[in-house]
Amino acid sequence: MTEKKEFQVNKNTPFWDASLTDQERIDWLLKEMTVEEKLGYLASSSPDLPRLGIPGVSVGGEAAHGVEGRNDQNGLGKPDVTTSFPQPIGMSASWDPELIRQAGEVTGTEARVVWHRHEGHGLSRWAPTVDLERDPRWGRNEEGYGEDPVLTGKMAGAYIRGMQGDDPKYLRCAATLKHFYGNNTEVGRGWKNSSIDPRNKYELYLEPFRRCIEDGGAEGIMTAYNKINGTIGILNPEVTDILKKQYGLRHVVSDGGAMGLVVTLHHYFGQHAETIATALKAGVDAMSDDPRMVEQAAREAYELGILKEEDMDRSIRCMMETKLRLGVYDRENLNPYDRVTEDDIDSPKAREICKELSRESIVLLKNENGALPLDKALKAEDIAIVGPLGDAWYQDWYGGTAPYRTTFLQGMEVLKQENITFADGLDRVVFRCDGKGLAVAEDGTLQMADEPDVFIKEYWGEGSYTFKSVRTGKYLGARLSESQGEKPKMGQIAADREEAFDWFVMEIFHVEPQEDGSVVLTNRFHYPVYRDAEGFFSFEQTEGTPITMEVVENGIEKAVAAVRDKKQVLLALGCNSVINAKEEIDRNTLELPEEQEMLLDRIAEVNPNTVLVLFTNYPYTLQKAMEKLPAIIMSATGSQDMGSAMAEAVLGTYAPAV
């Protein structure tokens, strides 16, 4: 946990007196604060006020489908285990607002527990995302609730009501809608303009925000990076004119780093002082940016006379209203939602709600001749599961650390109480260079060796590969730390991580065939793999080193052999949640990865009793599957019960549609 500078909290002031109205308490605070102190209170991370004995409380933290408490970016230490529900697009597919409300209640309660662990963090969460799914290629489709504003408003509104609770005075936690508005593409979102005509604006783009504020009671919203009809999201006066005055919204924050981007990407203003002055006047109350930069920009704006103390007071008031409703500044602990214990995380009730919502989020896309559910007479030995998603569970960026992760194979084997034949359909390959093999050394680095290591080649489409060592179970990728290995080097290639995961997924490779049959491997930034004179491999901005990639086991043929004599085949295909589609990355195609299509073709050809089990957070074109297979069933990822819920649906022990 980050250390907070110790000072004496002083609760013997009107600010801490819950018998006063919130406005009276804030009036006292604003009267007592100096201009200098107010300049430091315009960022989402607010500092302590030692002179007044008031500790700082930050807003922020993710909760798309449960509390995100990985703590891999905020310096708070080891991950907080929290309940992980299906992705929002999956929750919405349940069409069950009461069940989603219960999931929101779990999220809000667990946020309270995490708050007590890391006091000052995580009670105002940046969720849900209510941007409409306007393009199936959008990289963040998983975070939204669908393409319909009514559905989005109802389902996201239910999640909000659960998160915040129904007490007339206090909040369980605060929900913050994302992103106001027209945020429907990732590539270029920091500078692009969304041109929206009046009818689409009011009937589609604004409607989910209106419903989630007026009906769901959302406490805040986050502005978008993009321009809307030429106006940058953080500078948009509609924040006040529509959200606050018409819909009754309480507070507004900027997206992360948005204040700085007005100068560096939009090139709209020449200095941050102009940005913060205009943003505060537009109605944005807190800048989610470097607090020191925010404070300095505010100081310069104040000294220039373009930012008034009344502008700061208005924004501080809006943010303080939410903080008081959270109960964090009460002299006595009066918030009924604060009576939580460690037992409220991953509780039996939370598990029950997650399992039920995971079941209900499953969608049956095709079912001819009663192919599903499977015949109850089928034994485990009659079934084969094949495909890269059959025994996989992939972490997504806005998901937390789940208490457990259930894959489809695991779920099926638990219900059948026996092992089931499984083949992932992925090739096993070895790499060679200058007559020697490539292997993972004891320190994890990729080095020359007499005997090459075998790697599982995972192909995710759009040229993106990952390679996992069969021997160590870890993925090849680029080290970003200079403190590892015998020859520390930025960008050195090593097999260090058990999953391909990060903001920039450094385990992604692209394979560029050469005329002589060799390949050059490059990373996502197209830096090639280079071998230096000492035999170490790294990504460099230079000519790549040719490498031979040899298939030593054909994954598709192994899968074909596994299914040939089975009575039933379950073909598990789909996506990795952080490859090819996530924040800052849009898809370029709606097709399944080519190798998954090839696997589908071969399996359908060999065994017509094949059901496609699809684990995905975004749409695919499934023409081949619709033509060749009798049944298709789909689930979003993200749930700790993903695999077991799907197994129940496939075997008929639970019927999602009933």
Where are the regions a protein language model picked out?
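Glycoside hydrolase catalytic-domain context in secreted enzymes
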Residues: 1-658
